[in-house]
Regions:
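Short amphipathic alpha-helical interaction segments
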Residues: 198, 222-225, 247
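Local cysteine-cluster metal-coordination motifs and their immediate loop/turn environment
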Residues: 134-135, 226-239
Length: 324
């Protein structure tokens, strides 16, 4: 049993999805005050203006949803990102990997990196459990979070618990993760432990705690998407690609055009257009107000619903893909 009271900082890697939400709610159930819990959202498309962000991979409503969630529960929220997000990294052609930035508690923004060796990608991350091939997870989430911890002096000489929502049920790869272990940022100068409190949970348990707290999850779940984070996740099944094509035809076409331009597909054998042709759109893909909600960067819906209004979303218990 992890003694939550002994940590100076508790951080939650918060995508806005069901599993990271369940991990946050678990902390509340254990008596941790919400103001002690920092929600860390790694923006896979980058963050901010002036070329710092794209709109290729994630839901436009996600940043606003995360802000509303944090505001409702009165928990601090900090964004972190690689400049230009996945799209800039994917389009690297004889250039260095972009810098990493993060928000500090005083409102300032820290930045590091961007001066590494020059290289070329010109292809999407590939479907693989190998992080060097599936570089989206490492370059846009894992490395970003680690840089934000290593470059903030407030963690030096302190004890930090970094919580993430991976579950064993998701894949054989994630089943091998340890529930509790030293984080990659742990050193003689700072103590950082990684804790996966929902690792052994079945999906039903995730929905049970969300129902009990009456949390209105991200609209993507109501459309029928079984996972959040990247709406254009490279592990998406045929139905997900068919749904994305219906929800955001222009965004889908941009991805298809990149596959043609690169001469490499996301899936090793099949282009996204063919995969979409083989799938069926989710139930909510014909609900235009719901689609508009998911695509709204100024999302302002409620986070807590009346008990009689909470219903399990269309995306529950669906095929979500993920690292094998």
């Amino acid at each position: 049993m992890v003694n939550l009271a002994e940590y100076d900082f508790i951080l939650v890697a918060f995508s806005g999805g069901k599993d990271s939400t369940a991990a946050f709610l678990y902390l509340l159930d254990k008596g941790v005050a919400p103001e002690r819990i920092e929600l860390w959202h790694h923006s896979v498309d980058g963050h901010g203006g002036n070329g710092a962000a794209s709109s290729l991979m994630d839901w436009p409503s996600t940043p606003a949803y995360c802000k509303a969630f944090a505001r409702t529960f009165q928990a601090p929220l900090y964004f972190s990102w690689r400049l230009g997000g996945l799209e800039r990294e994917m389009l690297r052609n004889g250039t260095a990997t972009a810098p990493i930035s993060w928000e500090n508690p005083d409102g300032s923004v820290g930045t590091t990196g961007g001066k590494g060796p020059k290289g070329t990608r010109l292809k999407f991350p590939q479907v693989s459990a190998d992080l060097s091939t599936r570089w989206c997870s490492s370059y846009l989430k894992i490395d970003v979070g680690a840089a934000a911890i290593r470059n903030q002096e407030r963690f030096l000489g302190k004890k930090t618990l970094f919580i993430s929502g991976e579950r064993a049920e998701e894949s054989p790869c994630r089943a091998r993760y340890k529930v509790f272990e030293p984080d990659r940022t742990c050193s003689d100068r700072r103590t950082v432990h990684r804790y996966r409190p929902v690792h052994s949970w079945k999906e039903q348990e995730v929905w049970d705690i969300i129902r009990r707290h009456r949390v209105n999850l991200h609209p993507a779940y109501r459309i029928g998407f079984p996972r959040l984070s990247c709406r254009a996740c490279i592990f998406g099944q045929e139905d997900q690609w068919a749904s994305l094509r219906q929800v955001d035809p222009a965004g889908f076409q941009t991805i298809a055009d990149y596959e043609t331009k690169f001469g490499f597909t996301i899936h090793r054998k099949t282009a996204v257009g063919d995969r979409a042709d083989a799938g069926r759109p989710y139930a909510g893909c014909s609900d235009q107000p719901l689609i508009a909600e998911a695509m709204d960067p100024d999302w302002n819906g409620p986070i807590i619903l009346p008990e009689e209004e909470w219903v399990i979303p269309n995306g529950a218990f669906g095929q979500g893909g993920g690292p094998s």
